[in-house]
């Protein structure tokens, strides 16, 4: 998901900014369990001005707000994020309007294995064929909701398999399905001679399959059917 930063300097003058509020906290105990959280609020009071054609606004305040809470321990992590964007900031796509819990996960680790169930972000290699991330200021959040398994058989070798649906605003039923596998090998971690010489050598391989259903694009008086491949594979 993305939006175009459409607030030009002239248009920005028609808005009274609410000071951005962002607070983070960390609470830890002697039992090895820690809690991390944050709250963020960005808002504007829109003012209508016919001279610069700001248009009409249905609400007295426009804002995006987020609240995160994560529990971290030796073997199990869990967390969730609540978003309230009922009246999103100008420049964000209308489909952003809404609220809910778009990110919730549980992660377990044991003897080289790491299993995640829920929403997560991942990047294979340089991110050429798979990169999911969140950038709130740009309106980007393409997280994957599903499962991911990581395995490190030896130091320097990392294997990953995953599958799930990609976030599309607030409707996961219309989201595309993503499946993938990745292998990364850090040669210098396997070779003492390379480490002694200060050399670094990494090799990797990735495979991603994306599945999307057919789409009907409705136009006045016509019905266009978009013919695209349902399954698109990629290698890197």
Where are the regions that the model predicts?
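Bacterial N-terminal signal peptides
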Residues: 8-19
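Conserved, mostly hydrophobic/aromatic
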Residues: 117
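Surface-exposed extracellular loop regions of Gram-negative outer-membrane beta-barrel proteins
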Residues: 121-128, 132
